[in-house]
Amino acid sequence: MIDFGNFYQQIAKGPLSHWLNTLPSQLSSWQQESLHGKFKLWFNSLEHLPSLKPTSLDLNDSVTARIEPDISVGQREGIEKLLRNLMPWRKGPFSLYGVDINTEWRSDWKWQRVLPHISPLKNRLILDVGCGSGYHLWRMVGEGATMAVGIDPMQLFLCQFEAVRKLLGDDQRAHVLPLGIEQLPELAAFDTVFSMGVLYHRRSPLDHLWQLKNQLVAGGELVLETLVIEGDENQVLVPGERYAQMRNVYFIPSAVALTTWLEKCGFVDVRIVDICTTTTQEQRRTDWMITESLAEFLDPEDPTKTVEGYPAPVRAVLVARKPGAEL
């Protein structure tokens, strides 16, 4: 099964050492009691992947691994088959020894929108809440992060992350833990915390903001990306049963209202740095994610609306800071 021992060793002598009081038993219980019915199938594909160490690794402009001399056609086909066993791939893209994982989301586009507005990540300890397959963790490592820790309870995403890690030479600068933020103690240890595409899934969005704040060191930075609507500080959409075919969407505030929420939770220096309509070029069906995607979630007669009649997805990026001396 998944071995978290390297992570435990890495945090034993740093600001996350107190997490070891609870984390090992928590993850041990998870492995014994909470595995998904398909986990063994996913893990089997992961185990059969070759351990490769790239001779060329680009984490600055993409997540691309190459090797010289190149692997054979048969090896490449074998890798692709095993990676396809881990479908659907939602967050990426990845290019691994000639296997191009064309994911549902162009997560690199989101990163391009976020990166110019945040504090440099060099030498920072980072938490990414709802990290998915870990694409952005590798981009954070590319920016010089000391360590990028992702949490996401979806076990397929953990297997996808571990598959990519194995093909990147067992790189230990990034880690994914199968946890939700409500399962974390108040660590107050991370220099930067990312929450991208999570807030609208929370029944209590202000509680989520408090949870994020409790993971930051004093003066640490929050990077928040979420769905928003147009309007003033009093505008919040509370969808019915579904929004863009998603069942678990609870609150979509205006960007200005979200600023007020952050300030109410004690954040300072709150900035709206980007607002962008999600397009069917950024989120779409591919041969690595073959079910419905954004095009099917929009009104075919009016793409400015969802199939339910709500405003089509628009996402904002906000940056804020926990009080304390700037890092």
Swiss-Prot record:
It is an enzyme of class 2 (transferase). Signal peptide: none annotated. Coiled coil: none annotated. Its EC number is 2.5.1.-. One of its GO terms (molecular function) is transferase activity, transferring alkyl or aryl (other than methyl) groups. It holds the Pfam family Methyltransf_9. CDD domains: AdoMet_MTases (cd02440). Catalyzes carboxymethyl transfer from carboxy-S-adenosyl-L-methionine (Cx-SAM) to 5-hydroxyuridine (ho5U) to form 5-carboxymethoxyuridine (cmo5U) at position 34 in tRNAs. Belongs to the class I-like SAM-binding methyltransferase superfamily. CmoB family. This is tRNA U34 carboxymethyltransferase. It comes from Pectobacterium atrosepticum (strain SCRI 1043 / ATCC BAA-672) (Erwinia carotovora subsp. atroseptica). The lineage of its organism: Bacteria, Pseudomonadati, Pseudomonadota, Gammaproteobacteria, Enterobacterales. The gene is cmoB.
